[in-house]
C-alpha cells in the first residue's frame, strides 16, 4: 500500500473516493465538502437531508459523483460527539473508512484528517492513528481458506493542514510500522498448534534476527536443564514437541537503557493432567500471545531503532498430558532456588515465566516487562477488552498506563494487596502455583511472579488474557488475535530517555 500525505483541496483529489468526517455538533458541511457539494449540484446536502445524516457515531453517507467530480464517490462518516473524541476514535474511523471502501471495491482513496483536528492532538498524531486504523481494520487471516479475500489498497492519501505535512509524513511511517508489526503478531497467534511449535517459534525469532541484524540465542532441552530452569522444564515434559528458550537482542550503538521483555510462549495449553474442559481448551493456540507480541515488538524496533538495548525472552513450551507430565503435589525448584508446590498443572504459564524472570533479572536490566495470557480471573475482573497491570514500580506502571490511553490498548492497574500474599503460601514448599482462595486470582498470579524478580529491578506484569484474542471482533480487531500490546510497548521503548 502506497501512503501519501497531502494538503491540497479535496476537489482536486485524483482518487476513487474522498472520505471526510462530521461530528454531531457540526451544523453545516465543512468548507471543503461545501466546494464538492457545489460541483455535485447539491447532491451531498440533498442525500444528507434524505438519509438524516447527523454525524452520529459510525453513520455513513455515500454520495456517488456520476462523473461530475474527479472522484467516483464522496463519503461522509459520523464521528459522534466531539467531547468523546480521542486518538482511538480516529483509529475506529480509519477502520470504518476501509470497511466502506472494501464494500465499494475502491482501492485508491483519500481520508481527510483535517476535520479531526478538533481533537487535542497534533494532526501528525491524528494522521498516524488514521493509518493504524486502516491497516489494523483491513487485516484478515485467510491463509487456510480456499477462497481468499482479494481486496488490496493500492493508494491511501491522508489530507492534513500544510504546516503539519512534514511531521505527518514521519508519524505515518511510524504508524504503518506499528500496525504492520501488530498484524505480524496476529498472524503468528492465529496459527494453530500443529503449525507453531516451540521450535517453530524459535525459527521465527531467528528469521527476525537475520532480517534486522539482531543477536539471538536458542537453548534446547539439555541447555535449559543446565541453566536450572526446572519450573519451565516441568511444564514442557508432557509434550512430544520439545521446549525452546529464546533470547533475542537488539543492541544499538549507544543505548540509553536496557529493557527486558518477556512473553508467555505456550504454543498450546491443554491444561496438562488437570486437563481443561473442551470449551476452555478451544482457542488455546492463543496462549502464545505474549511471546508473539515480543516478536512483533522486535519487528517494529528493527525498523524504528530506539536508543535502548532490548532483550526479548520467551520460554516456549507446550502443556500436554502424558506419562512424563508433571503432577499436582509435585515440588519443583526454580532457577533462583525458590521451591514451588504444584496445586494445578493448568497454572503452567507462571512456571515458565518464573524461570524467564530469573533469567532476565540476571541480565541486570533497567526494567522488566512481561506480557502473558495468564489468568481467567483477570478477564472476570476487567472484561474481555482490558489488560491488568501490576508490578513493583508505580512510576513504570504509570508510564505504561499513560501510553496505553493513547494507543487504545486498554489497561487498568491491579493492586498488590499484602493480604493476598497469604494465599500463595504452600504447606511443603516456598510458594504455591495457585492461590488458596477463589478470589483475586489475577493478583495472586502476579504476586507469585514477584518472587522470581530481583527486587532492585523495576518490573511490570501485564495480564493480557482478555484482550489478546477475541471470538467476535470489535472495532479494528477482526475475530481472532489482536496483537495486543505491540503498539503500547514499542511506543514505550521509543519514548525512553
Curated annotation (Swiss-Prot):
It is an enzyme of class 3 (hydrolase). Keywords: Aminopeptidase, Cytoplasm, Hydrolase, Manganese, Metal-binding, Protease. It holds the Pfam family Peptidase_M17. One of its GO terms (molecular function) is manganese ion binding. It catalyses: Release of an N-terminal amino acid, Xaa-|-Yaa-, in which Xaa is preferably Leu, but may be other amino acids including Pro although not Arg or Lys, and Yaa may be Pro. Amino acid amides and methyl esters are also readily hydrolyzed, but rates on arylamides are exceedingly low; Release of an N-terminal amino acid, preferentially leucine, but not glutamic or aspartic acids. Its EC number is 3.4.11.1, 3.4.11.10. Mn(2+) 2 binds at residues 264, 269, 287, 348. Its main location: cytoplasm. It comes from the Bacteria. Binds 2 manganese ions per subunit. Its cofactor is Mn(2+). GO terms for biological process: proteolysis. GO terms for cellular component: cytoplasm. Mn(2+) 1 binds at residues 269, 346, 348. The keyword Zinc does not apply. The keyword Phosphoprotein does not apply. InterPro entries: Leucine_aapep/pepB, Macro_dom-like, Peptidase_M17_C, Peptidase_M17_leu_NH2_pept, Peptidase_M17_N. Belongs to the peptidase M17 family. Presumably involved in the processing and regular turnover of intracellular proteins. Catalyzes the removal of unsubstituted N-terminal amino acids from various peptides. This is Probable cytosol aminopeptidase. The gene is pepA.
Amino acid at each position: 500500500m502506497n501512503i501519501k500525505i497531502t494538503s491540497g483541496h479535496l476537489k482536486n483529489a485524483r482518487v476513487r473516493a474522498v472520505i471526510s468526517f462530521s461530528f454531531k455538533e457540526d451544523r453545516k458541511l465543512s468548507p471543503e465538502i461545501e466546494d464538492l457539494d457545489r460541483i455535485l449540484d447539491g447532491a451531498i446536502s440533498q442525500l444528507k437531508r434524505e438519509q438524516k445524516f447527523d454525524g452520529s457515531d459510525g453513520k455513513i453517507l455515500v454520495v456517488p459523483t456520476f462523473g461530475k467530480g474527479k472522484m467516483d464517490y464522496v463519503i461522509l462518516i459520523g464521528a459522534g460527539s466531539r467531547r468523546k473524541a480521542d486518538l482511538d476514535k480516529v483509529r475506529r474511523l480509519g477502520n470504518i473508512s476501509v470497511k466502506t471502501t472494501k464494500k465499494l471495491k475502491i482501492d485508491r482513496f483519500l481520508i481527510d484528517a483535517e476535520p479531526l483536528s478538533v481533537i487535542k492532538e497534533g494532526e501528525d498524531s491524528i494522521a498516524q492513528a488514521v493509518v493504524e486504523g486502516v491497516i489494523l481494520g483491513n487485516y484478515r487471516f485467510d491463509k487456510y481458506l480456499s477462497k481468499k479475500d482479494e481486496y488490496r489498497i493500492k493508494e491511501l492519501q491522508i489530507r492534513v493542514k500544510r504546516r503539519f505535512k512534514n511531521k505527518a509524513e514521519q508519524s505515518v511511517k511510524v504508524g504503518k510500522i506499528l500496525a504492520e508489526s501488530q498484524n505480524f503478531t496476529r498472524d503468528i497467534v492465529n496459527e494453530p498448534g500443529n503449525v507453531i511449535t516451540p521450535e517453530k517459534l524459535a525459527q521465527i525469532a531467528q528469521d527476525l534476527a537475520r532480517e534486522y541484524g539482531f543477536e539471538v540465542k536458542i537453548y534446547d532441552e539439555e541447555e535449559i536443564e543446565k541453566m536450572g530452569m526446572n519450573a519451565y522444564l516441568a511444564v514442557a515434559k508432557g509434550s512430544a514437541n520439545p521446549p525452546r528458550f529464546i533470547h533475542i537482542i537488539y543492541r544499538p550503538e549507544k543505548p540509553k537503557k536496557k529493557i527486558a521483555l518477556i512473553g508467555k510462549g505456550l504454543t498450546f495449553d491443554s491444561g496438562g493432567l488437570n486437563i481443561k474442559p473442551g470449551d476452555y481448551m478451544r482457542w488455546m493456540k492463543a496462549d502464545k500471545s505474549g511471546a508473539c507480541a515480543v516478536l512483533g515488538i522486535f519487528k517494529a524496533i528493527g525498523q524504528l531503532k530506539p536508543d535502548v538495548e532490548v532483550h526479548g525472552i520467551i520460554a516456549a513450551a507446550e502443556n500436554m498430558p502424558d506419562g512424563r507430565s508433571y503432577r499436582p503435589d509435585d515440588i519443583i525448584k526454580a532457577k533462583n532456588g525458590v521451591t514451588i508446590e504444584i496445586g494445578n498443572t493448568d497454572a503452567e504459564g507462571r512456571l515458565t515465566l518464573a524461570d524467564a524472570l530469573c533469567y532476565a533479572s540476571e541480565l541486570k536490566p533497567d526494567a522488566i516487562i512481561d506480557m502473558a495470557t495468564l489468568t481467567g480471573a483477570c478477564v472476570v475482573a476487567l472484561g474481555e477488552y482490558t489488560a491488568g497491570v501490576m508490578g513493583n514500580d508505580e512510576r513504570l506502571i504509570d508510564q505504561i498506563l499513560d501510553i496505553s490511553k493513547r494507543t487504545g490498548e486498554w489497561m487498568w492497574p491491579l493492586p498488590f494487596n499484602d493480604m493476598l500474599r497469604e494465599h500463595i503460601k504452600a504447606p511443603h514448599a516456598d510458594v504455591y502455583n495457585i492461590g488458596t482462595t477463589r478470589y483475586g486470582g489475577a493478583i495472586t498470579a502476579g504476586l507469585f511472579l514477584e518472587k522470581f524478580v530481583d527486587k532492585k529491578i523495576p518490573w511490570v506484569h501485564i495480564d493480557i488474557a482478555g484482550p489478546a484474542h477475541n471470538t467476535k471482533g470489535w472495532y479494528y480487531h477482526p475475530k481472532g488475535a489482536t496483537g495486543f500490546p505491540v503498539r503500547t510497548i514499542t511506543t514505550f521503548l521509543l519514548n525512553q530517555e
